[in-house]
Structures are given as structure tokens and as C-alpha cells.
UniProtKB/Swiss-Prot annotation:
GO terms for molecular function: gamma-glutamyl hercynylcysteine sulfoxide synthase activity; iron ion binding. Catalyzes the oxidative sulfurization of hercynine (N-alpha,N-alpha,N-alpha-trimethyl-L-histidine) into hercynyl-gamma-L-glutamyl-L-cysteine sulfoxide, a step in the biosynthesis pathway of ergothioneine. This is Hercynine oxygenase. Pathway: Amino-acid biosynthesis; ergothioneine biosynthesis. It holds the Pfam family FGE-sulfatase. Its EC number is 1.14.99.50. Fe cation binds at H51, H134, H138. NCBIfam families: egtB_TIGR03440. Monomer. Its cofactor is Fe(2+). It is an enzyme of class 1 (oxidoreductase). Belongs to the EgtB family.
Length: 446
């Protein structure tokens, strides 16, 4: 992978504006709607809106120093500290009104664009890229919240997607063994977040990985075969949670064979990647299928490494920026594309749809790469590393249909609790090259 130039100020301005336009579309509802909490897992949309502005002001106008005075009074600003106020509590806080939040965000953005325009050409612009990423990540969070909303739909059914391709579901590709470069440096990706860095060489034995993510039809076969009722496919923690939560199918699947998506009740497309499954469900499905979940290191090698050239690709298909012909990104579709829809987006090993569509659970806990150095926002990764005391997390890779193309790359690492399923997460299987069958455990019931 060759180094990537730091974006020019005009390109940064474009990214900031695109992110804000997307945010404003997601909050283009009346005040009562923006103040609602659709689920205790999520914030009211008006909290996300003001938090986006608060973080932008903190990092781009105040140098990341909360002691420097800002536009908000300290007592108001602390309402938007995600570490102080858990999501379930935010609906009860004396938040800015929707009109106040919009004005605050607009005032901050105007000052930020002025500051960007005055920056010297050789200035460090990492904080600007970090803020773009932060806003887009909250946009995806707001889409999760809107998907949990009950009542008449607020959003349409999404833009059209290319058709899938028969014969790819359930197939796998070989990833040769050997060393590869895991992670990136800032010279490779100027806005790579701290947990993606530094680049370093690791050796990975040969393995096979699913050509495409697991589909709804494949998941239906798991259900019909009693996969949710058979203890043998589940880990101890997974079975305990499956019984506690009464899991019988992916979230938003209805007993009549339909699903509910952003308030729309519709047939479940058999060739779409399954989404809204927990890590525990993904793990159980993999065991039932005679497979396993990939490690995140395996996933990144399958996505980015080109053994023919002995170097990383910037994207699975090469170094060219994502387009609508290569991946389903940006959120407009409001759903994953059918498997096989993007053959031109395949990685060097032949894996398809590795960026976009659904986040993919891996078996890996979140750990720092050797030589990890925290970025200016030191609380982004460190509190969530394994052993840091904030809970159990598993890494997800690849982004989803809701992720913006400006911020996604093969090295991007997401993470969540293994019980979360409101996220747009699915499954891609992996196999050791010398093992293709499951090893059933004990049978049991709840």
C-alpha cells in the first residue's frame, strides 16, 4: 500500500459538510420525535445532535481542552459527556431543545469552517478527520435508534441496490498462510484512529473464509434445524444469554416470516446478509455450520492483503476510492445488498462484500496493537481494551450499509458487547484448512 496524501482543506470541508448534511436529514423531525427515547439502549436523537456539536467545538475550536470556555455553560456541556451519562438516563436530562441544538451546531460549524480556511497548508489536520469520523459514527447510531422506533415509518424503504448473484452463498475462498502487514500508519491513512496503528507484520496460518456473509436463507435453515433450541452449538455464556433473553431468531424477524425494518413490515429477502444477531448467535451459527468466526487478524488479511504483490491494498479491490459499483455504503439503501452484488469489489483472495452491508463479528476481544499510542482523544479506545474494566467486548469488522465511505477502511475496528443486536451486524464464517466439521458439545435445554 502506498502512502495516502493528507486531504486538502477543500476536501476536509467537503467531508465536514457531507457529514453534517447527513446528520440534519436524520433529525429532520418534529421536536417531540427528537426528544423521544425509542429504547433504553439508545439516546434521544436530540442528545446525539448536540453531542456532535459539543465534540466538534471541543476538538476543533478549543484544542481538546475542556477548561477553555466554550459556547455552552459547563453545567450544560457535561450533559453531553457519554462517560458521565449512560444512554438510558439521557432522556431525563435537561437537554438543549432541538432548536437550540441546531443553532449550536450551526454556530460551531461556521467557526470551524472559518478556522479550517485559515489553517496553514502544512498544519496538522488529524483532529478534523477525527471529528468527521465521530459525526458519521453517531449518524449510524441514530439509524440504529430509528430502526428501534415503533409506530408509522419515518424513513422510506431506501434506495435501489444491484441484484445479487446466484451460487455464491455458502462458498469459501482460501487465504494463503504467511506474513502480512496488520494495521496502518498515519503515512498510510492520515486519519486512522489510534487502535488501527501502528502497522506491523504478523504471521497467519492458511485458512478459508466465506466468500460472502451468511444469508437470511442460511440462517433460516439454522432456525428450522433447531439451532436456537440445541445447547450443543452454544458457548456457556451464549446459552445462558439465549435462555435469559428468549432468543429464537434475529432481532426484527417476526413469527409470520416477515421482518420489520424502519417500521416497514416486509418479506425477509433470502439472499440478503443476515443482520441484527449477537456475537453469541454468530458463534452458535458458526458451530452448527461446522465453522468458526474469523479472528480480526484473519479478517483483515482476507480483506486487504494481496499475496501476488506482497503488500496491502487500501481497499479490498485496490487503491481506488469506494463507489456505488464496489460497495454498499453511505446509508441511503437502509439495508444490506444481496450477496454477490459487488463482484468488482472482491479482495485479492476473492472475498466479496467485506466493506459495507453488515458489520461482521470476529472472535477477537479488543486489544491494542503492539506499540499502541493513544491519540488526542485518549478515551476513544483505551477504556474498552480487554482488561480495562469496562466490560466484555468483541471486535466487528467491515462496516455496514450505514457507514460513510469517507471513514471506512480495512483497518477500521469497531467493538461492542457480545449481547448487542440492534447494531447492523452479521456473520462471515472461517475454517481451518484441515478441519471442516463441527465438534458438537453436550445437548441441553433452557
Amino acid at each position: 500500500m502506498t502512502g495516502v496524501a493528507v486531504p486538502h482543506r477543500a476536501e476536509l470541508a467537503r467531508q465536514l459538510i457531507d457529514a453534517r448534511n447527513r446528520t440534519l436529514r436524520l433529525v429532520d423531525f418534529d421536536d417531540a420525535e427528537l426528544r423521544r427515547q425509542y429504547d433504553p439502549l439508545m439516546s434521544p436523537l436530540v442528545w446525539d445532535l448536540a453531542h456532535i456539536g459539543q465534540q466538534e467545538e471541543l476538538w476543533l475550536l478549543r484544542g481538546g481542552d475542556p477548561r477553555r470556555p466554550g459556547l455552552l455553560e459547563p453545567a450544560v456541556e457535561q450533559l453531553y459527556d457519554a462517560f458521565v451519562h449512560p444512554r438510558a438516563s439521557r432522556v431525563h436530562l435537561p437537554l438543549l431543545s432541538p432548536a437550540q441544538a441546531r443553532r449550536f451546531c450551526a454556530t460551531v460549524r461556521s467557526a470551524v469552517l472559518d478556522a479550517l480556511d485559515r489553517l496553514p497548508e502544512d498544519a496538522d489536520t488529524f483532529a478534523f478527520g477525527m471529528v468527521v469520523s465521530h459525526e458519521h459514527q453517531h449518524d449510524e447510531t441514530m439509524l440504529q435508534a430509528l430502526n428501534l422506533r415503533s409506530g408509522e415509518p419515518l424513513l422510506g424503504s431506501g434506495t435501489a441496490l444491484p441484484p445479487g448473484r446466484p451460487g455464491v452463498a455458502g462458498t469459501s475462498v482460501l487465504v494463503p498462510g504467511g506474513p502480512f502487514v496488520l494495521g496502518v500508519d498515519l503515512a498510510d491513512e492520515p486519519y486512522a484512529l489510534d487502535n488501527e496503528r501502528p502497522a506491523h507484520v504478523v504471521d497467519v496460518p492458511a485458512f478459508r473464509i466465506g466468500r460472502v456473509p451468511v444469508t437470511n436463507a442460511e440462517w433460516r435453515a439454522f432456525i428450522d434445524d433447531g439451532g436456537y433450541r440445541q445447547r450443543r452449538w452454544w458457548s456457556d455464556a451464549g446459552w445462558a444469554y439465549r435462555c435469559e433473553a428468549g432468543l429464537t431468531a434475529p432481532q426484527f424477524w417476526n413469527p409470520d416470516g416477515t421482518r420489520t425494518r424502519f417500521g416497514h413490515v416486509e418479506d425477509i429477502p433470502p439472499d440478503e446478509p443476515v443482520q441484527h444477531v449477537t456475537y453469541f448467535e454468530a458463534e452458535a451459527y458458526a458451530a452448527w455450520a461446522g465453522a468458526r468466526l474469523p479472528t480480526e487478524i484473519e479478517w483483515e488479511k482476507a480483506c486487504a492483503w494481496d499475496p501476488a504483490t506482497g503488500r496491502r491494498r487500501r481497499y479490498p479491490w485496490g487503491d481506488a476510492a469506494p463507489t456505488a459499483a464496489l460497495a454498499n455504503l453511505g446509508g441511503d439503501a437502509l439495508r444490506p445488498a444481496p450477496v454477490g452484488a459487488y463482484p468488482a469489489g472482491a479482495s485479492a483472495c476473492g472475498a466479496e462484500q467485506m466493506l459495507g452491508d453488515v458489520w461482521e463479528w470476529t472472535s477477537s476481544p479488543l486489544r491494542p496493537w503492539p506499540g499502541f499510542t493513544p491519540m488526542i482523544y485518549q478515551r476513544y479506545s483505551q477504556p474498552f481494551f480487554e482488561g480495562a474494566g469496562s466490560g466484555d467486548y468483541r471486535v466487528l469488522r467491515g462496516g455496514s450499509w450505514a457507514v460513510a465511505a469517507d471513514i471506512l477502511r480495512p483497518s477500521f475496528r469497531n467493538w461492542d458487547h457480545p449481547i448487542r443486536r440492534q447494531i447492523f451486524a452479521g456473520v462471515r464464517l472461517a475454517w481451518d484448512v484441515d478441519r471442516q466439521t463441527a465438534r458438537p458439545g453436550p445437548v441441553g435445554g433452557c
